[in-house]
Amino acid sequence: MEIQHYDNDGRGRWFIEADGETLGEMTYFWNSPEVFTIDHTEVGEKLKGTGCGKKLVRAAVDYARQHSLKIRPTCPFAKSVLSAEEFADVLA
């Protein structure tokens, strides 16, 4: 399954779809041109326990690193994943 990214008008999401059904998503909004806040992560029953939630967070980290951005996580799940030392460089 491929993680897709959509950004529009100050908000966006990374998501996983199959057969037109959203199976997991992580949403965010822009605080400034350099910082975005991850405010929600959700994985459907079909993907629970598969690591897809962490893959969504990693997609955001990859995006932040590629574009020299910072992440402010308010979603408890994203906050937990991003507390690892390996992600310190992208935290706002």
Residues covered by each model-derived region:
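Active-site rim helix/loop that mediates acceptor-substrate recognition in acyltransferases
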Residues: M1-R13
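Conserved acetyl-CoA binding element of GNAT-fold acetyltransferases
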Residues: V35-E45
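Conserved active-site alpha-helix within GNAT-family acetyltransferase domains
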Residues: R65, L69, P76-A92
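Conserved beta-strand in the GNAT
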Residues: E21-F29, T37
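Conserved acetyl-CoA pyrophosphate-binding loop and the N-cap/start of the following alpha-helix
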Residues: L47, G51-L56
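Conserved acyl-CoA
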Residues: K55-K70
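Conserved beta-hairpin
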Residues: R13-L23
